[in-house]
């Protein structure tokens, strides 16, 4: 019915309906194929119902699905990047808020242009990443068992939440602390005039570095589920963890000020021991179930 209505509309408005007819046929075939093999619609994936796939997919069908999901992922990514380019001035103003009162200079003719494109690209990737992860899950989950799906879904959701919390922590705590240190350190000697491009490289590296550091509990849970490292072992090596957190904090922090490194190292320690505690809880629940 929807297919016939599409053709009727195209005839009414005298469009080139032959091309649309071909596209509609292909689209209808894809929907039929998807519902035949996955038992549900695109928006509510079959995999969330935890049922077994009744029909095995051939290699050609797998490749077709990969192509479709890659196409939609790339389309959403491109759309988000273009949208961020359109509203890049608003994004730039938001990233400039932690450095209120600082004057930015452009040392090259195209510095602002290329820096704004870079900011828009990172922002577009960040915004489109949930959809891309969703498409990957729709492709991977049907081939997994019920227990594997129950394990993977909370980990993926938790990872995305922690990544967002890392960005928030970096923007509201780490970035202001680091900038205040640099501003006050030489305020009585020099007047701060910062390079526009170097400032945004500093901000982006610090934000994404903090977001990656927040993935530590997810990594610990994966190691615990795979029984590579137990929760007790994670707690037993706490001395090495303190040393390693200091090194990681120094590496992920683009600045050399001790305050930012201490803050990041402290949050890494909190995340590590929180992840180790979660691993112990999971191990205890698995023993009770057995």
From Swiss-Prot:
GO cellular component: chloroplast membrane; TAT protein transport complex
GO MF: proton motive force dependent protein transmembrane transporter activity
Organism: Guillardia theta
Listed name of the protein: Uncharacterized tatC-like protein ycf43
PANTHER family found in the cross-reference section: SEC-INDEPENDENT PROTEIN TRANSLOCASE PROTEIN TATC, SEC-INDEPENDENT PROTEIN TRANSLOCASE PROTEIN TATC, CHLOROPLASTIC-RELATED
Statement: the UniProt record of this protein carries the keyword Transmembrane: yes
Protein's membrane topology: Multi-pass membrane protein
GO biological process, one term: intracellular protein transmembrane transport
């Amino acid at each position: 019915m929807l297919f016939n209505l599409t053709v009727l509309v195209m005839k009414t408005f005298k469009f080139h309906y032959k091309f649309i007819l071909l596209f509609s046929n292909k689209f209808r075939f894809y929907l039929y194929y998807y519902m035949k093999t996955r038992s549900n619609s695109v928006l509510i994936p079959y995999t969330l119902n935890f049922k077994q796939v009744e029909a095995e997919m051939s290699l050609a069908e797998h490749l077709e699905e990969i192509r479709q999901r890659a196409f939609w992922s790339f389309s959403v990514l491109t759309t988000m990047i273009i949208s961020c380019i359109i509203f890049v001035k608003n994004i730039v103003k938001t990233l400039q808020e932690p450095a209120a009162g600082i004057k930015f200079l452009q040392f090259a003719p195209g510095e602002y242009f290329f820096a704004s494109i870079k900011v828009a690209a990172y922002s577009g990737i960040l915004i489109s990443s949930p959809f891309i992860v969703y498409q990957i899950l729709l492709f991977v989950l049907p081939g997994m068992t019920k227990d594997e799906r129950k394990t993977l879904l909370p980990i993926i959701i938790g990872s995305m939440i922690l990544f967002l919390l890392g960005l928030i922590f970096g923007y509201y705590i780490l970035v202001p602390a680091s900038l205040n240190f640099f501003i006050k350190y030489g305020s009585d000697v020099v007047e701060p005039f910062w390079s526009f491009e170097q400032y945004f490289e500093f901000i982006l590296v610090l934000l994404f570095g903090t977001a990656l550091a927040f993935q530590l509990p997810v990594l610990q849970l994966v190691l615990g589920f795979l029984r590579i490292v137990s929760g007790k072992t994670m707690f037993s090596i706490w001395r090495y963890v303190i040393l390693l957190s200091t090194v990681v904090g120094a590496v992920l922090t683009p600045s050399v000020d001790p305050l930012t490194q201490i803050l990041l190292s402290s949050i890494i320690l909190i995340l590590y021991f929180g992840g180790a505690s979660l691993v112990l809880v999971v191990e205890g629940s698995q023993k009770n179930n057995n």
